[in-house]
């Protein structure tokens, strides 16, 4: 029986991953930067320009949103440490998307490299 880690390892064999240093250029060239973490994780801090489509909704969102129909979209994905992003990249490739990349190490690697993260600011009350 396969574990989640087995599935992630298998997914990583068939996808394109970029490290944190390559990620900046990949993000600039991307049509979509997608954070596949859950909404609460996204709201605690995310990469600038990222949209949140949680892993559990990804295939449904791409199947039902006409703006996401083009299989030529240049897509960069990330999650906490790259497991969910790898599974997401594999799914999108299986759906026919041609240009999908995952950031190796996810937002944890991004933050470890001291790259900027957008965090929400709440209004101050006196």
Q: What is the role of each PLM region?
A:
Residues 1-32, 39-74, 83-126:
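Rhodanese-like catalytic fold shared by cysteine-dependent sulfurtransferases
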Residues 78:
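Short, surface-exposed ligand- or partner-binding patches at beta-edge/loop junctions that are enriched
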């Amino acid at each position: 029986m396969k574990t989640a880690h087995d599935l992630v390892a298998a997914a990583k064999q068939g996808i394109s991953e970029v490290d944190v240093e390559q990620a900046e250029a990949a993000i600039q060239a991307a049509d979509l930067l997608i954070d596949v973490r859950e909404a609460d994780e996204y709201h605690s801090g995310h990469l600038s320009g990222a949209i949140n489509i949680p892993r559990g909704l990804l295939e449904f969102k791409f199947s039902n949103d006409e703006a996401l129909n083009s299989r030529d979209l240049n897509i960069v994905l990330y999650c906490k440490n790259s497991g969910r992003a790898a599974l997401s990249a594999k799914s999108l490739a299986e759906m026919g998307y041609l240009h999908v990349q995952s950031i190796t190490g996810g937002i944890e690697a991004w933050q470890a490299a001291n790259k900027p993260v957008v965090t929400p600011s709440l209004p101050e009350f006196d």
